[in-house]
C-alpha cells in the first residue's frame, strides 16, 4: 500500500500539481532564497516558483502598531515596508515518492484522494466493502503549519495554510477582497 491511504497516497494524487499542498508566503523579498523543507513535515517555505498574489505597503508606528496599510502594485514604491504575498506550491519530497503532500483544504483534491484510495478498496471488494473494510483510518491529515512573526518589526518569511479557493470563499463570506 506504500504508506497509503495515508495523506500521501503514495504520491499518486499529487503527481498532478493542482492537488499539492499550498501555502501563502508573506515576505519582504519577492525573490529570496529557497527555504522549502521537503521532508515529511507540513512546513511551508519558499520554493523558488512562487506566484505573486498581492503586494502591500505597511506602515508601523515607533512602537510597532499598525498605522496604515494598502494594497499596491508590485512596481509601486512603498512609503513603509513593502510586503509580498506569494502562493507557494509544495515541492517534491522523497518521503512522498518524489511528489508532495495533498492539499487537504481543497475539496477537489480530497475527492481525488478518496477516488484513488477508498474507491480502489471498494472496487476490489465490491459489495463486501463495509464488511471486509469496515473502516479506513488515518491520523495524519494536515495542512501547512502556520508560522508567526516574533514581533511586529520582524521581517522573516512566514507561511500560512492556503488553497486556491480561499479568495473566493472569503469574498463570499465577508463581501470583500482578502
Put a short name on every predicted segment.
Residues 9, 121, 151, 155:
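Sparse, context-dependent recognition of short Cys/His-centered cofactor- or disulfide-binding micro-motifs
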Residues 82-83, 131-136:
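Beta-sheet entry/capping signal
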Residues 113-116, 120, 169, 173:
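Residues that form generic nucleotide/phosphate-binding pockets
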Residues 105-108, 132, 169:
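Surface-exposed loop/turn and secondary-structure junction residues enriched for glycine/proline
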Residues 178:
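Conserved, charged catalytic cores of large soluble enzymes
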Residues 1-79, 84-111, 115, 126-127:
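Acidic/aromatic-lined carbohydrate-recognition and catalytic surfaces
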Residues 134-175:
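Carboxylate/His-rich catalytic cores and anion/metal-binding grooves
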Residues 120-133:
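Segments forming glycine/polar-rich beta-alpha architectures that bind adenosine-containing cofactors
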Amino acid at each position: 500500500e506504500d504508506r497509503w491511504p495515508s495523506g500521501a497516497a503514495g504520491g499518486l494524487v499529487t503527481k498532478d500539481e493542482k492537488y499539492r499542498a499550498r501555502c501563502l508566503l508573506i515576505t519582504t523579498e519577492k525573490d529570496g532564497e529557497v527555504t522549502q523543507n521537503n521532508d515529511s513535515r507540513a512546513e511551508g517555505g519558499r520554493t523558488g516558483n512562487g506566484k505573486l498574489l498581492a503586494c502591500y505597503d505597511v506602515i508601523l508606528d515607533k512602537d510597532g502598531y499598525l498605522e496604515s496599510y494598502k494594497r499596491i502594485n508590485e512596481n509601486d514604491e512603498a512609503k513603509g515596508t513593502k510586503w509580498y504575498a506569494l502562493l507557494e506550491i509544495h515541492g517534491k519530497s522523497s518521503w512522498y515518492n518524489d511528489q508532495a503532500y495533498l492539499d487537504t483544504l481543497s475539496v477537489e483534491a480530497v475527492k481525488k484522494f478518496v477516488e484513488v484510495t477508498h474507491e480502489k478498496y471498494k472496487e476490489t471488494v465490491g459489495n463486501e466493502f463495509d464488511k471486509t473494510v469496515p473502516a479506513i483510518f488515518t491520523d495524519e491529515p494536515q495542512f501547512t503549519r502556520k508560522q508567526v512573526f516574533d514581533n511586529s518589526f520582524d521581517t522573516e518569511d512566514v507561511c500560512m495554510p492556503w488553497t486556491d479557493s480561499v479568495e473566493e470563499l472569503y469574498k463570499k463570506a465577508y463581501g470583500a477582497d482578502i
